[in-house]
Each structure stands twice: as structure tokens, then as C-alpha cells.
A protein has these predicted regions:
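Terminal presequence/propeptide segments associated with secretion/organelle targeting
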Residues: 1-444
Length: 444
């Protein structure tokens, strides 16, 4: 699509040092004999160059925001390669390391490195008085509640209940359903790289961003999209703490967003980066009422908060990636029990009570386990053997968190039950082996 080269000028631009991150979508008008005509929106700038020089995305291309992708590069002779005006990602109550979990979401997006800023929450009366019009600041909300993550840009046009903004993609995800809320710019910080905005974010959902395309974000007013409600309970030495937040109900996003919120809140509860043990219990509710309950454990020698947070998004990633149907996750209730002790043991020795066992009988195996900095313990497990076994049988013994490693042994693929329907996938999630369990497999 074509872009229009412009030079921004005037007292405001002089004060800000040029086009700032967060100004993307700012409407540009041309004076005509019939009055001002909307040319388009500020969309692209040249990094480490004159910040007053920018490229405008034409309004006709923004109105056709469902068209195909543009070239991967936008280059202007004499100026070099242009990049989209950086979109500030505003974080409220999110640490730098929790924000790092978000990086995969922005890795393929056609945006410049994002200035990450702490934001505040605007008062309710400001939301009530907010007017959505060209030039207004809005925030596309990814997480809201006790954790907030949103991206700030500018409205280009509001036409017949439809909104156009940004003048370039945000994540480049195509068809989306993301809520947008008011944003209130508090300051513009000059910078030699790219000036950027500081802003507070409102809570009132103004509508839904439905298209995240190369030329614009396009959305509808007064239409609130579905979100995933997350309730998080943390139980540790300081007692129980409860939190709540909502994340975008996009399968490409919610596993990472849930994990990001969990890491921030676990970090806040622990107050330190240290090793330990965590037990996670999920209740995932799908639209229609079906529930998936899971229990899992994780141990880490140096960073239990990060390990638990990454695990928190695991079942959601499985649901999001399934090939059978949309998961339609509605709610996630997550209870996390934290312990600063290392609750892990290594399997030091396994001894068969008898090396000869009749088919259909059970093999008894004595295991010596070495817990972390505690006395070794001996446990005996009983392994029932099928009646049709004959010849030499190998017993594979591992912890539930250890993947199957068979070496030169050949496993019958028919014995490895892979889900074939969405219902079977849910059953597999419910019954999957926990990290605290021992797995003994007989292989012929």
C-alpha cells in the first residue's frame, strides 16, 4: 500500500522532539477549499533519524483494513528503511522479568522495540467524561485487573460506529477480538531514539478491536469482546492471598498472558527470587460449562516463581494448540501452594525382589530414593504384569516429570495412546502423570 511522506512541525512537535511512540494513528489533515480533508494517520518513522519526518498511512487503506499483508520492509530513497511508530506497552504492577514473558507475543510483529512503562489507572469519573474522537488516545487491553498490560495509540477516525486507529499493526494477528479502553496521556518524554508517551489507562470498555492489519486497527464501538477470567490463590508461609485478572480470549495470547500475570503475583507474594516447591491445581471452565481439573507439581533450585508461572500456562497452551476444535476457555481458577523447601528426590537404585516372575503375577521392585538434604528412603512398588507376557521384560522407572527415554528399546506405537478427539484430549489432560508420581513401564 502507498505511504505519504510528511514533515511534522509546530510548537507541539518542537516540545516533544518529534513524532513520539504512541502517536501512531494521529490523524493528518489537508487544507482544501472545501475544508480540512483527512489524509490518513501517522504510521511510520525513520529510527535514529529526524523524528519530525514520518510516513502517513492513507485513510482509504485504513478503511480497507482487511486486505493482505504489505511488504516486510518499507524503504524510501534518501531516507532509508521506515518502521512503524513504536507502540508503548503500558504495564501496571508488572515487573521487568514478568514483562519478559510477553516478548514472544511481539517477536514477529511489525513494530519497533517497545518502550515498556509503568502506568496508572484513571479514575472512574474520567472514564465517564471520556470522548472518543479523532486524536483521542486509546489502549488495547491484553490484561486487566490486579495486573494490567495494554498498548497505547491514537484514534484516526470514528465512522458509523467503526473505529480506525494506529495506522500500522499492533501484533499483526489479523482477525482478533481485543477490548479497547480510554487512555490519558500524562507526559511525552523526549528521546534521542524515539520520544515516547506516558499514560494512564481507563477501565471502561469502549468496544472491540476486530482487525489487526498492516494499515490499521479496526474495531466496533459498544461491543465488548469475551475475555478469560482468571482467579489466582496463593498459599504460602504468609497465608492465603487472592487475586483476579482478565486476559484476552485469543488462543494465540492467553497461555502467555495467564503465565505473565501469575509470575508477577507469585513474585509479589514471595518477595524474593529463590528455589522451592509449588503445587498447582487448575479448574479450567470451557464455554458450555465443561470443566477440566488438573494437579501438578514443580520444583526449582533457584527460581520457583518462574517455574510455577511457566507451568501455569501449560494446560492452556495444550488447549490452544489442539487440532480438533476451538477450546473456548471461559474461566481459569488456579490455586498455587508454595514451599521454600526443595521437595525433590533422585532415584538412586532399583532392585528386583525376584528376577523371575510368572506371567500374570506382579513384580516387586525396591527403590532407594534420595530426597534433597534428607535421609535416603526405601519404597517398594508392585508392578502387575499381563498374562500374555513371555521372555525377557525390561522395567523402565522414572519420575512423572521425566520424559520417556527408551534408548534402543522399541515401543509398540499402538501402546502409546494419543488422543483422537477433543474429548479424549481433555481426558488425557485430566489423567496425565504428575511430577510427584513414579512411573513404571514394562517393555518387551
Amino acid at each position: 500500500f502507498p505511504l505519504v511522506l510528511v514533515r511534522a512541525d509546530g510548537p507541539f512537535i518542537e516540545r516533544t522532539g518529534g513524532v513520539a511512540a504512541g502517536m501512531s494513528g494521529s490523524p493528518v489533515y489537508l487544507a482544501t477549499e472545501h475544508g480540512d480533508a483527512l489524509l490518513g494517520a501517522i504510521g511510520y518513522v525513520f529510527p535514529n533519524a529526524d523524528h519530525r519526518v514520518a510516513l502517513v498511512t492513507p485513510i482509504a487503506d485504513m478503511r480497507a483494513a482487511d486486505r493482505g499483508w504489505p511488504p516486510a520492509r518499507v524503504e524510501v530513497p534518501g531516507y532509508g528503511e521506515a518502521v512503524p511508530v513504536a507502540t508503548p506497552v503500558l504495564l501496571s504492577g508488572v515487573s521487568t522479568r514478568a514483562a519478559a514473558l510477553l516478548e514472544p507475543l511481539f517477536g514477529d510483529a511489525r513494530v519497533t522495540p517497545l518502550p515498556v512503562q509503568l502506568s496508572g489507572t484513571a479514575p472512574a469519573d474520567a472514564d465517564a467524561a471520556f470522548r472518543l474522537e479523532p486524536g483521542s488516545a486509546i489502549a488495547v487491553s491484553l490484561i486487566s485487573g490486579d495486573v494490567q498490560v495494554s498498548a497505547v495509540g491514537t484514534v484516526t477516525a470514528v465512522e458509523d460506529g467503526r473505529l480506525l486507529a494506529f495506522g500500522h499493526p499492533f501484533l499483526g494477528s489479523g482477525a482478533v477480538a481485543l477490548p479497547f479502553v480510554p487512555a490519558y496521556v500524562t507526559a511525552i518524554v523526549p528521546s534521542s531514539e524515539v520520544p515516547f508517551k506516558l499514560a494512564n489507562v481507563g477501565a471502561r470498555v469502549l468496544g472491540t478491536i476486530e482487525q489487526d492489519r498492516p494499515t490499521a486497527l479496526a474495531g466496533r464501538l459498544d461491543r465488548e469482546p469475551p475475555t478469560v477470567a482468571v482467579s489466582l490463590s496463593l498459599l504460602g508461609s504468609a497465608g492465603e492471598q487472592r487475586y483476579a485478572y482478565r486476559v484476552a480470549a485469543d488462543e494465540r495470547l492467553y497461555p502467555v498472558l495467564v503465565a505473565t500475570g501469575a509470575l508477577q503475583l507469585i513474585d509479589r507474594a514471595l518477595g524474593a527470587t529463590d528455589g522451592g516447591f509449588a503445587e498447582l491445581a487448575w479448574e479450567i471452565t470451557l464455554r458450555g460449562g465443561e470443566r477440566v481439573n488438573l494437579l501438578e507439581q514443580v520444583n526449582h533450585p533457584s527460581d520457583i516463581a518462574l517455574a510455577a508461572a511457566q507451568l501455569a500456562g501449560g494446560p492452556l497452551a495444550v488447549l490452544a494448540a489442539n487440532r480438533y476444535r476451538g477450546a473456548d476457555v471461559e474461566r481459569v481458577s488456579l490455586n498455587v501452594r508454595l514451599d521454600d523447601r526443595q521437595r525433590v528426590a533422585s532415584l538412586e537404585e532399583a532392585v528386583l525382589e525376584s528376577e523371575e516372575v510368572a506371567a500374570g503375577d506382579a513384580a516387586h521392585v525396591h527403590l532407594r530414593l534420595q530426597p534433597h538434604r534428607e535421609r535416603a528412603v526405601v519404597r517398594t512398588v508392585t508392578v502387575p504384569l499381563p498374562s500374555d507376557l513371555a521372555g525377557e521384560v525390561t522395567l523402565l522407572i522414572r519420575g512423572g516429570a521425566v520424559p520417556r527415554a527408551t534408548g534402543d528399546l522399541e515401543l509398540d506405537e499402538k501402546e502409546i495412546d494419543a488422543p483422537r478427539t477433543f474429548g479424549e484430549l481433555l481426558d488425557a489432560l485430566r489423567s496425565r502423570v504428575q511430577a510427584s508420581e513414579l512411573v513404571v513401564e514394562a517393555v518387551t
